[in-house]
Amino acid sequence: MRGAGGPRGPRGPAKMLLLLALACASPFPEEVPGPGAAGGGTGGARPLNVALVFSGPAYAAEAARLGPAVAAAVRSPGLDVRPVALVLNGSDPRSLVLQLCDLLSGLRVHGVVFEDDSRAPAVAPILDFLSAQTSLPIVAVHGGAALVLTPKEKGSTFLQLGSSTEQQLQVIFEVLEEYDWTSFVAVTTRAPGHRAFLSYIEVLTDGSLVGWEHRGALTLDPGAGEAVLGAQLRSVSAQIRLLFCAREEAEPVFRAAEEAGLTGPGYVWFMVGPQLAGGGGSGVPGEPLLLPGGAPLPAGLFAVRSAGWRDDLARRVAAGVAVVARGAQALLRDYGFLPELGHDCRAQNRTHRGESLHRYFMNITWDNRDYSFNEDGFLVNPSLVVISLTRDRTWEVVGSWEQQTLRLKYPLWSRYGRFLQPVDDTQHLTVATLEERPFVIVEPADPISGTCIRDSVPCRSQLNRTHSPPPDAPRPEKRCCKGFCIDILKRLAHTIGFSYDLYLVTNGKHGKKIDGVWNGMIGEVFYQRADMAIGSLTINEERSEIVDFSVPFVETGISVMVARSNGTVSPSAFLEPYSPAVWVMMFVMCLTVVAVTVFIFEYLSPVGYNRSLATGKRPGGSTFTIGKSIWLLWALVFNNSVPVENPRGTTSKIMVLVWAFFAVIFLASYTANLAAFMIQEEYVDTVSGLSDRKFQRPQEQYPPLKFGTVPNGSTEKNIRSNYPDMHSYMVRYNQPRVEEALTQLKAGKLDAFIYDAAVLNYMARKDEGCKLVTIGSGKVFATTGYGIALHKGSRWKRPIDLALLQFLGDDEIEMLERLWLSGICHNDKIEVMSSKLDIDNMAGVFYMLLVAMGLSLLVFAWEHLVYWRLRHCLGPTHRMDFLLAFSRGMYSCCSAEAAPPPAKPPPPPQPLPSPAYPAARPPPGPAPFVPRERAAADRWRRAKGTGPPGGAALADGFHRYYGPIEPQGLGLGEARAAPRGAAGRPLSPPTTQPPQKPPPSYFAIVREQEPAEPPAGAFPGFPSPPAPPAAAAAAVGPPLCRLAFEDESPPAPSRWPRSDPESQPLLGGGAGGPSAGAPTAPPPRRAAPPPCAYLDLEPSPSDSEDSESLGGASLGGLEPWWFADFPYPYAERLGPPPGRYWSVDKLGGWRAGSWDYLPPRGGPAWHCRHCASLELLPPPRHLSCSHDGLDGGWWAPPPPPWAAGPPPRRRARCGCPRPHPHRPRASHRAPAAAPHHHRHRRAAGGWDLPPPAPTSRSLEDLSSCPRAAPTRRLTGPSRHARRCPHAAHWGPPLPTASHRRHRGGDLGTRRGSAHFSSLESEV
């Protein structure tokens, strides 16, 4: 090898001068070639003298014959190697130095090869000193004492073929890491190099990724005695001990350890240093190794030696001579000659010359081995072996170290067997396995540390049973195994107490018999290459004939896996949440049946709509039909805000409430289940088993179904035995491994994969994207299990069965299944959530409807019983008045309307002016369409901007009673009262309101469609009043008021015959009227009624403050008129009837007048009592008070100037007319005869009234007009009073305050209040 400072380099001249000086100083200058004599100068080989020094008498016999053998073994081009053997007898360091110096001074040598028996630990420092002093290369071929050399002398060329202490520790720590022996203690004596030993340990543990547990260092004194040494060794509890000591010190240390019980099974000793060479043997295999005192070494001792520790002496010496020869050859190639080195130990130190020569020995190769040395003189890549002392005290190679890689023979002690127990053939098992996730998972070792993680077990792909494999033999590849079955194996080894060696089968199969030969794991057990086989090994009949199986630890079978295919949303996906049976049951059965049930209950209810038809009171009115019932139930199901008509009967309402609850459940279930069907559906094929037609006849499908399995397994065996046609078809689609089959499924090249259920379920749960699914949520066919295969009649079967049953009982198997067999994909939940709801799921709500129908029948019967029988037994009560007052008070508190201003004191009485009729208005135009709710609110609030004639006091009383709500039927007039002057005349004519559309039919008393008003004179026998002149209309007060009128009869031409105007002069154009002779025009229709003022002649304490709200002036401004024999109080009232009608107690509760205004009389005030109605009776059923029917004590103003006939005369009685005995009750047509003015007999304390003709549903049970004898007195809550202050009476009769106070016996007023409250809640 050419160095950097060759002759042609920049330092060539300086080196040439150095070489010339050395040549001149040499004692043999004639043999040194010149600079140009490369290759031998004269053509001959240059002689190379190498001294072979043996220290010890053991080498005396062999030293004489080593020279020729070494010279023949080492041949170097251009050099003539001449070994010279010398034997040193002295063993002490002084004798060794003197002998070496004398030898070197008498010989011309170029190098020294040293061999010793390591009895002199100080040999290495002496050799290192001599090399530095003389610049001679010295090679120690046996190691021995050279291992303790540290640090090295400067300029020394002392080389060692053995390994250093640091290199030995590196190999030892690899062994500890391989077996997970991480806890250890260092034991040393004070031998040379012990400090370096401890420092090397600190360096290796601190910089490692392994969690080493260094429990300390013990420094022993071998001369202290065994008791002291034993106590020191027991002071640290560690089963792994690293010992560094001299050979003579090892005997007392091991004796003390044996006495302390720290040797033998359970404890491992690693020895570092030259202590094991020589002594009781030369290391030859089979020869017992003894300590110097004859004591044997403990079994299980580990040591690290050089790879040539078993080579003979000639080979070891030849290796050292070859190192010197290769270095001299490189030096000769660079300089052309071999320099003479120093031979005088007492001469001056030549350190600079040694530094320049050392580099020629850095890269040397001989016999295909690397002998390159580092700066410390040790081999860079030594070949080392790990040896272990067996029970028969022989050394066995258990591992090798080459190229920084450790290879061990497995097992020494099983990692998961009894800890550190020596290998016992009777308790050691060879276990075969096969990779298949998740049962056996094979991974490479850690690339950084080269070891397996703690939850895995080392396993080999090839088992090597030889003790010392040849160098060219294939070595097993180190792998790491983990998984479900590996965890079971570890628990079995710990519970039963055996060690094991785990390896992977070479053919990668479970086991199948091919040409009479079994392969796979079954073949390994059957041919006794393995003691046990564990993995995903299915138990079947064919395998059970040749091997024994343990009890199954995993239940499995055959399953089918497919891939999800993307689909589209079906057009009928919105119907998928329910099955067809549920839809039919819902809309055909339930909706129809419940609708008919509600209709029947409503039709037969005492308060239902059919009541008007049955009694003939409301012909042509609103009815609750089957169509409306179905529409109501349909709207409740889908929660639509559509106009509906609600039933009024209690039974019908209960049924509707139950249906609403049913609709909530039905709609909520539909909404919750709809999302699973509206998403993009994924198609998953389904089969019933291996006998399904899709597997047995795949060609009949288009495209044909492609399915397969993994051959040579139990699945294929089952299919081949039971379904041969199916097996012959699927052979073309079989896959070599499970992973490849899953890839084919995802790629669409395979439609179905048949395999073990346990493996497929795990793969489906662990699949990325959850695209793979087992058919039927893991449905298993041909159920079986996984077991452990053993030899026939194996003694391990019973212990393994008992241990597995214990694991099953302790739920350890279940815990392992959750750990290894679970995943993130859960197909079961998805299928359950997307299933249709059938009749069984919705049976509860249908049963609820049936029960509700049964309960409704009971309520229906009770309702009729109460209405027809029990209600007549109930007496009057004040509870309803209290509840009504409380309800109205709560409404007033919750109302946002401002409180009305306080009432003003009543003004003094003023004379009433003569009434005047306003001019007729043209017919109203068509009313614009207004929604029902908005129209109702507008009609309620229209009167807020107007007030009654006579001032604000009238409105204050109205607002105090009703709160913010003002019904249209009681509107405060079309215009406010005009301010009056001093004469009491109005200053301007009143304003009118725009026409209003009739209200919709919210309640029973609201008309759906109003017929046209009959024209003037339509009623025979009732003359129409003469129309006042237009000029007088402007000066007269506000129009008169009347009771609300409701008529649902056909139009006037078909209902009332038109009378002769001459016989009815008051209907327009009579002789006595101001408009006589004028053509009769159709009267204009009114959109809203005029304001009405009512008086209560029997005030109650609750109405006392309302009684003072109006004075005489206010009453004077009312100017009402009442014509005794005409249903319309004045001519202008021929407009349209009002759109709202109110109950009697509402009308009677609002008083526009004052009790104090009545003119004083000497006696008690006379009352005008009669039966009041919500609507004006059609003629002749009307309430009237004739002029001559007034009491003589009443004050009456003069009649109007346009009134015809004699002046009115006073009458003593006023009452309700008795129905005509010959006129049917259902008829509304008036006869042509003159009106009947009934006279009633006055009794003490009251008036005897004839029975009335009820015309309204609210008054059908009015008890104020008894149907008994005429002598029955009108008393109690049915008394109604009306004061008639004018000669023509004040106005239509109204109920009194007593009717509000006593409502218990008046069903009509209770209904009217309920209707009024319902309308209040709507608005």
Curated annotation (Swiss-Prot):
Residues the entry annotates as binding L-glutamate? S536, T538, R543, S714, T715, D756
The protein, known as: Glutamate receptor ionotropic, NMDA 2D
Tissue expression per record = Detected in neonate brain synaptosomes (at protein level).
Q: Which GO terms describe its cellular component?
A: glutamatergic synapse; hippocampal mossy fiber to CA3 synapse; NMDA selective glutamate receptor complex; plasma membrane; postsynaptic density membrane; postsynaptic membrane; presynaptic active zone membrane; synapse
Q: Where on this protein are sugars attached?
A: N89, N349, N363, N381, N464, N566, N712
Q: Which residues lie within the membrane without crossing it?
A: 627-638
Q: Which residues lie on this side of the membrane: Extracellular?
A: 28-579, 672-840
Assembly mode? Heterotetramer. Forms heterotetrameric channels composed of two GluN1/zeta subunits (GRIN1), and two identical GluN2/epsilon subunits (GRIN2A, GRIN2B, GRIN2C or GRIN2D) or GluN3 subunits (GRIN3A or GRIN3B) (in vitro). In vivo, the subunit composition may depend on the expression levels of the different subunits. Interacts with PDZ domains of PATJ and DLG4.
The way it spans or sits in the membrane comes to: Multi-pass membrane protein
For bias kind Basic and acidic residues, which ranges apply? 931-940
Species per Swiss-Prot/TrEMBL record: Mus musculus (Mouse)
Record flagged with keyword Transcription: no
Q: Give GO terms: molecular function aspect only.
A: glutamate binding; glutamate-gated calcium ion channel activity; ligand-gated monoatomic ion channel activity involved in regulation of presynaptic membrane potential; NMDA glutamate receptor activity; transmitter-gated monoatomic ion channel activity involved in regulation of postsynaptic membrane potential; voltage-gated monoatomic cation channel activity
Pro residues: compositionally biased ranges: 899-929, 987-1001, 1080-1092
Query: What are the Low complexity biased-composition ranges?
Result: 977-986, 1030-1039
Q: Where are the compositionally biased (Basic residues) regions? A: 1208-1228
Gene that this sequence comes from: Grin2d
- Does the entry annotate any disulfide bonds, and if so which pairs? C101-C345, C452-C480, C459-C481, C770-C825
Signal peptide range equals: 1-27
Q: What does this protein do?
A: Component of N-methyl-D-aspartate (NMDA) receptors (NMDARs) that function as heterotetrameric, ligand-gated cation channels with high calcium permeability and voltage-dependent block by Mg(2+). Participates in synaptic plasticity for learning and memory formation. Channel activation requires binding of the neurotransmitter L-glutamate to the GluN2 subunit, glycine or D-serine binding to the GluN1 subunit, plus membrane depolarization to eliminate channel inhibition by Mg(2+). NMDARs mediate simultaneously the potasium efflux and the influx of calcium and sodium.
Subcellular localization(s) per the UniProt record? Cell membrane; Postsynaptic cell membrane
Q: What is known of its domains?
A: A hydrophobic region that gives rise to the prediction of a transmembrane span does not cross the membrane, but is part of a discontinuously helical region that dips into the membrane and is probably part of the pore and of the selectivity filter.
Which UniProt key words apply to this protein? Calcium, Cell membrane, Disulfide bond, Glycoprotein, Ion channel, Ion transport, Ligand-gated ion channel, Magnesium, Membrane, Methylation, Phosphoprotein, Postsynaptic cell membrane, Receptor, Signal, Synapse, Transmembrane, Transmembrane helix, Transport
